């Protein structure tokens, strides 16, 4: 088995989960998910940064990226990896995109519970929950795909690249005035 190629494929095929997170920033801002309400601890449930438009828009952008990856893979005779079929090129990226943004929301929920306000630095709580929940969704809903591309080493590689990639994308978003803070 060609492990370097499999690692590259794992990264490329995970792009919908990564893109969805950035897409949420671009499409967000409308219909705050927690509607301004507080949890039983008196703190906001999620904060103003988690919106329905971001969740749906980011997921849509993630799905579109998956379809694009499928067609590029098809044109290159699947050297970049393969979702399996045209239908799966929509389904698998949808699972990853919705998983990614659900993980981002869960990370925000945990951050609020430990006293980190919306926009505050959360370290790995800002970076890993979206990837971990995308993996969980894949494992639960697309197990054959998950087991082929995301064995132990594939997960480790993704988790290793997420923090610097997340930081770089957030700095770009900050410079483009799409984010209030560069993290």
Curated annotation (Swiss-Prot):
GO cellular component, one term: plasma membrane
Necessary cofactors: Mg(2+)
Role description: Catalyzes the formation of CDP-2,3-bis-(O-geranylgeranyl)-sn-glycerol (CDP-archaeol) from 2,3-bis-(O-geranylgeranyl)-sn-glycerol 1-phosphate (DGGGP) and CTP. This reaction is the third ether-bond-formation step in the biosynthesis of archaeal membrane lipids.
Reactions performed catalytically: 2,3-bis-O-(geranylgeranyl)-sn-glycerol 1-phosphate + CTP + H(+) = CDP-2,3-bis-O-(geranylgeranyl)-sn-glycerol + diphosphate
Keywords per UniProt: Cell membrane, Lipid biosynthesis, Lipid metabolism, Magnesium, Membrane, Phospholipid biosynthesis, Phospholipid metabolism, Transferase, Transmembrane, Transmembrane helix
Topology versus the membrane: Multi-pass membrane protein
Pfam family, one: CarS-like
EC number: 2.7.7.67
GO biological process, one term: glycerophospholipid biosynthetic process
Transmembrane domains' residue ranges: 11-31, 60-80, 86-106, 122-142, 145-165
Family affiliation: Belongs to the CDP-archaeol synthase family.
Keyword Ribosomal protein: no
This protein's pathway: Membrane lipid metabolism; glycerophospholipid metabolism
Subcellular location(s) of the protein: Cell membrane
InterPro entries, per database record: CarS (IPR032690), CarS_archaea (IPR002726)
Name the UniProt record assigns to this protein: CDP-archaeol synthase
GO MF annotation list: CDP-2,3-bis-(O-geranylgeranyl)-sn-glycerol synthase activity
């Amino acid at each position: 088995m060609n492990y370097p190629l499999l690692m590259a494929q794992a990264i490329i095929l995970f792009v919908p989960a990564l893109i969805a997170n950035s897409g949420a920033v671009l499409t967000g801002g409308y219909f705050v998910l927690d509607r301004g309400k507080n949890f039983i601890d008196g703190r906001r449930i999620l904060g103003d940064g988690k919106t329905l438009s971001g969740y749906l828009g980011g997921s849509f952008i993630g799905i579109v990226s998956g379809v694009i990856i499928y067609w590029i893979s098809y044109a290159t005779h699947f050297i970049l990896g393969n979702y399996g079929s045209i239908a799966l090129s929509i389904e698998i990226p949808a699972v990853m995109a919705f998983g990614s943004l659900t993980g981002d929301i869960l990370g925000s929920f945990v951050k609020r519970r430990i006293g980190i306000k919306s926009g505050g630095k959360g370290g790995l709580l800002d970076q890993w929950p979206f990837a971990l929940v995308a993996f969980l969704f894949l494992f639960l809903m697309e197990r054959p795909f998950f087991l082929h591309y995301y064995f132990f080493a594939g997960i480790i590689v993704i988790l290793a690249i997420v923090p610097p990639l997340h930081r770089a994308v957030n700095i770009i978003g900050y410079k483009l005035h799409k984010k209030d803070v560069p993290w």
